[in-house]
Amino acid sequence: MKSILIIGMGEFGKHLANRLVELKAEVCVVDKNKDIIKVLAEQFENAYVADCTQDIALRDFGIHNFDACVVAVGKDFQTSLVITSKLKEQKAKYIIAKASDDLQSKFLIMAGANETVYPEKDVATKIAQKCIANNLLDMFAISDDYSVFEFNVLDEWVDKALKNTNIRAKYKLNVVAVRDGDDIIAPEADYIFKATDTVFAFGKTSTIKRIIK
């Protein structure tokens, strides 16, 4: 079981913590606001009040024991920088820090973050893609260039076997799963697409242009 420390329990931190729990991770949540933690303590077994800009607070958590530490502090960028730097000093295995733009990301990487995320930018990108692509239901960025797409099965695939759709050659996509009603399956080559199916496929993010309807 992966163990994750999340520092900063704003909306992003809360959603992340909930999703990690759903994925069976061991989650420790921290915020300096005692009122926030009082509420979260009813939901999370490990919920603590602490000012993580202070060395002694971080030492108490045994930072090196976590598989990843997420700095999800809201609008106070200086605090994010300080916490990221101190996590690095205390030998955090992997640090993910929230950024608002490329400049913040650059400084967070310099301070010790292994990776930065842009929640607002990612959500805006996803909504924009969905607005222009009626078929697109969701997308999950894997890297700057590649994503997993969830979209309604294309009309031309209905009643065809996966192996006969020419998906890889025509659309540059690899189908990884199909949602059939309430079930998500890994389709075999002879799987026959239904009109009600939704498809999960992996490919270059630019491939979205190929499935826009």
What are these language model-derived features?
Residues M1-K213:
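Cytosolic regulatory regions of ion transport systems
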